[in-house]
Amino acid sequence: MESKLNLEEIKRYLEEHQEEFYQVSDAIYEYAELAKEEIKSSAALEHLLEAFGFTVERPYKELPTAFRAVKGKGELSIGYLCEYDALPGLWQDPVPYQKGNGNSGHGCGHNLLGVGSAAAGIALAHLAEKNEWNIRVVVYGTPAEERYSGKTIMANTGAFRDLTVCLGWHPLDHNDCGMTKFKAISSFEIIFHGKKAHACNCPELGRSALDACELMNVGCNYLREHVNRDCYFHYCYTNGGEVPNIVLDQASVWYLARAYTFEEMKALRERILDVARGAALMTGTQMEYRISSENPDNRLNFTLSKLAYECMEEIGAPEFTEEDKNWSREVASHVDLPEADGEFDNEVTKPMEDRVVKDNGSSDISDVSQIVPTVNLYMTCYGRKTPNHSWAISAQTKTHAAHVGMLRAAKVLALMGSRLACESNLVEEAEKEFSHPLSL
């Protein structure tokens, strides 16, 4: 009975304030600020939380665009995670076909993610105040997920250790209750140092750092055949020179290496670095490398995933309009992927302890999951099989359908928080499982 009353109050409260949440999400869409530059975006979320009675600490943990917002007091501390950084080159006018200007845009839906998490925290804090629950609601602003792994930086400087449990979500083209395994990842740059020379008159006097990069990349592409099939790596040049008639004395390439365990990722990175050392030897150059970030694989929590499923079922599927569907279908018609049909996925698969979904991607929420019991949900906000990190996502993150999905996420996360506040056994089970994590 109590859960039913909490559910109705959460729905009523969030729907009463939904226009405020939509406006902030749309504003962050327009700001479209890149990692570590989210000044307006973080301020918008901070002001929203302050308007609902949260005390906001900013900047937080050495990051100017990070924050920590708190409301309530108690030993039980329930955390929510906001993201709000955009991606380069993915600006999209709000039309269902590709029309951008080359600027940054929200091709991963973080304008929705940040506001959805903040709204969940606001709703739970309201319910706690109304029912006089002895809990603390903490909303973390975690910038720079896309490039610098902001949560990793924050975790390494002491963040998240005040939480009992942490609840996260991400807008996607389907629903998931959090039994998704992310890969460990390392971001690192390899810099080669050689000798300059005229590329035509006296190239024999030079030692080409660019040639070293080229040979390294060729070697690494041959390496792909000889690593575990679950291992991925990708690269791009960060310095390839400005003119072709100079033998470059410095060139660099940026690599990402991924694997399903932290140990396997580190072994993969070392093999890539061995190839780089070989390229330096072949070209008579020197090699150095800089690791900018590394994230572990995430620690799953079946107790929290079960809770997420139950709350999703209680909230019910989002109601997308025919106009929503037409917009999504129009976007899909301009995406060269047969499986992107523009339909909305309303199914929710019941989580099972022995059925883990392997995701080829990575997330800095994995760092949080190593500190405190954590779950990360997916919520349908746009059409099925829409390719992530593309204009087609940007075209759908400022729509009615996106708002509907975001508000549903807020309802689910707030309801999860209310049940954790009322059912101490859930917290105990989540903590026990955290001490003995599931393995693949």
Language-model region placement:
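Acidic/His- and Gly-rich active-site-bordering loop/insert found
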Residues: 3-106, 111, 115-135
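General structural feature for long, well-ordered alpha-helical segments within catalytic domains
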Residues: 6, 17-24, 37-48, 76, ...
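Metal-dependent amide/peptide-bond hydrolase catalytic core
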Residues: 214-440
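A short small-residue
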Residues: 4-5, 23-27, 98-103, 192-200, ...
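Short Gly/Pro-enriched turn/cap motifs at secondary-structure boundaries
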Residues: 57-60, 145, 178-182, 355-359
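Histidine/acidic-residue-rich, glycine-tolerant segments that coordinate divalent metal ions
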Residues: 65-66, 87, 95-105, 111-112, ...
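Divalent metal-coordination and catalytic microenvironments
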Residues: 28, 69, 80, 110, ...
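Non-cysteine beta-strand/loop elements that form the S-adenosyl-L-methionine
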Residues: 79-81, 193, 376-380
